[in-house]
Amino acid sequence: MKLVLPYMNKVFIIPAVALIGVLLAGCMKWDYGLEESFNETGEGLFITNEGNFQYGNASLSFYNPTTRKVENEVFYRANGMKLGDVAQSMVIRNGIGWVVVNNSHVIFAIDINTFKEVGRITNFTSPRYIHFLSDEKAYVTQIWDNRIFIVNPKKYEITGYIECPNMTMESGSTEQ
């Protein structure tokens, strides 16, 4: 026996489901990453928060010792996008913070006063640390890659690499 309820047919069900979806979406808070403005002196402490591997939730915090205030998620708040997956390290050189995000295969260059991205270097295997030799040359070590990358920080590009032939996958990374 088939039970047929009046008004419970496709003509009613489809619009009802659509209406419920619209009502629920209207109640949800969507965060599209609105950008905030910062005007710090750059004189403070940056804290790279590694985040969980493969969750893309790394973040950058800034502690101002004068105000004794910590600002969390400053990269996200200044740029409207997440830092990425596993913030490994950060180096400051000439007013630019270089944030190495290893599982996202990127190094972000940020203004240390505004936290805004001013450039990025991409196409690494899994970068870990950056070491500057000059304004136009830096080395980037990696994990699970037997090369040390040579980059030009002014042009935000990889210019070459140094082979480390005795490095094996068991030894892990080129900084060892």
Residue ranges and their predicted role:
Residues M1-G26:
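Sec-dependent bacterial lipoprotein signal peptides
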